[in-house]
Design a protein with these regions (language model features):
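"…together with the soluble PPM/PP2C metallo-phosphatase catalytic core" -> "…together
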Residues: 1-276, 280-311
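A short, structure-level motif marking secondary-structure boundaries and short turns
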Residues: 11-14, 39, 199, 320-322, ...
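Short, surface-exposed acidic
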Residues: 38-42, 347-352
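Solvent-exposed interhelical
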Residues: 223-234, 328-351
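Short basic/hydrophobic patches in alpha-helices and adjacent helix-turn junctions
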Residues: 294-295, 320-323, 339-342
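Juxtamembrane non-transmembrane "cap" segments at the membrane-aqueous interface
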Residues: 313-333
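Final/C-terminal transmembrane alpha-helix of multipass membrane proteins
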Residues: 348-368
């Protein structure tokens, strides 16, 4: 419980908030100038008047947080042996999100070759080298088609199977860093009230899965003004407290920096939002959340610290399962926040109640971290 570390963390948060407030107006102007705005063409989750209200809203507002956090961390957070991989993984994930955002706006719709068509071409195509190419790329085609159950259908943006590959890369880098660079202590899983359980190399697939799942969970929650930003603010505030309690200086400062930047972002993102986070922010910050929790060896707390995000993601998984295998819907619409919209709840009511529930679980996570 170092007072000096807490004082320094608060300074980082203040600097990040001030920097983000200054950058926000510039970013909004640039997004509008280059027409990086929400389009009803692919935002099929919006309904009625809400669709019309949000069309033309700048997206990629998450760049505000990504830029400020990266700049302050690289300039002032001197323990780079602990921060270069989290920032790098955040950057990879944010790049993927930016590509998806931009392709959804400016890209052309792509067509996927079906598996039966590929098999037919292997048999009947006149040129042997084309047949060879189809044979060599058959595993990729099978993987591509198998992800259609997750919604990887032809469109403008980055498709699910493409996202999974890049997210796997981000997860693999994180797993390498935790397993080989942070030391044997991180080969164990901390359990509240009990101690540590050795996972040995099993920690590697666990880390990869959690980085991928958490990034997508945060992405799914970015559906209402203020929901993802405010929930991330609460999460990183709690994570700052846990890092400080644990005496992890580099991560206390990094999490405080994210918290400060999110204060400014959320100010501009609450309804009516000046901009929306976009995939560039949700995927980047979701990956950073996962890696920062695991880097302080509190992996077991990740579903608690990210409670709302995990609930939103699970609601989508359950909806897909019920529709595919039981032939009916579990929710009126997924993710969960849209279910409550269809029940007649206002956007503000949903967001505020989700925030409060999320805050409650973050308090539980802080308490558990001290046991």
């Amino acid at each position: 419980f170092s007072p000096n570390l807490l004082q320094q963390a608060l300074l980082y948060a203040i600097l990040a908030a001030m920097g983000a407030f200054i950058l926000a107006s510039i970013l909004v102007s640039l997004l509008l100038e280059f027409k990086i705005t929400r389009s009803a063409e692919y935002d099929f989750t919006l309904k009625g008047g809400e669709r019309l209200f949000k069309v033309g809203k700048p997206i990629m507002g998450g760049l505000l947080v990504i830029i400020v956090v990266t700049a302050i961390t690289l300039l002032f957070n001197c323990e780079r042996s602990y921060t270069y991989v989290p920032i790098g993984v955040m950057g990879i994930s944010a790049f993927l999100g930016a590509a998806d955002d931009l392709l959804n706006i400016f890209g052309k719709k792509r067509r996927n070759r079906t598996l039966p068509m590929t098999l037919t071409l292997i048999r009947v195509h006149k040129k042997w080298y084309v047949r060879l190419w189809y044979i060599l790329t058959l595993p990729w085609t099978i993987f591509q088609r198998s992800t259609s159950v997750l919604g990887s259908h032809p469109g403008k943006g980055v498709l699910v199977h493409e996202k999974l590959l890049l997210q796997f890369l981000a997860g693999a880098i994180t797993a390498w860093w935790i397993y080989f660079k942070l030391g044997p202590q991180w080969h164990t899983l901390w359990i509240p009230f009990d101690g540590f359980v050795s996972l040995s190399w099993w920690i590697i697939p666990l880390v990869i899965f959690l980085v991928m799942f958490t990034a997508n969970a945060v992405n799914i929650a970015d559906g209402l003004d203020g929901l993802a930003g405010g929930s991330l603010l609460i999460t990183f505030a709690g994570l700052t407290a846990i890092s400080w309690i644990e005496g992890r200086a580099a991560f206390t400062l990094l999490n405080a920096t994210v918290m400060g930047a999110l204060i400014a972002y959320t100010y501009f993102n609450v309804k009516p939002a000046r901009f929306q986070m976009g995939d560039v922010g949700t995927l980047g910050l979701g990956a950073l959340l996962a890696i920062n929790v695991m880097a302080i060896n509190k992996t077991i707390l990740l579903p608690v610290l990210g409670f709302i995000f995990y609930i939103e993601a699970i609601s989508v998984i359950l909806q897909v399962f019920f529709r595919r295998f039981l032939g009916r819907r579990l929710f009126k619409m997924s993710p969960l926040h849209h279910h409550f919209e269809f029940k007649g709840w206002s956007e503000e009511r949903i967001v505020m109640r989700f925030w409060l529930i999320h805050f409650f679980f973050v308090l539980i996570a802080i308490w558990l971290s001290m046991n």
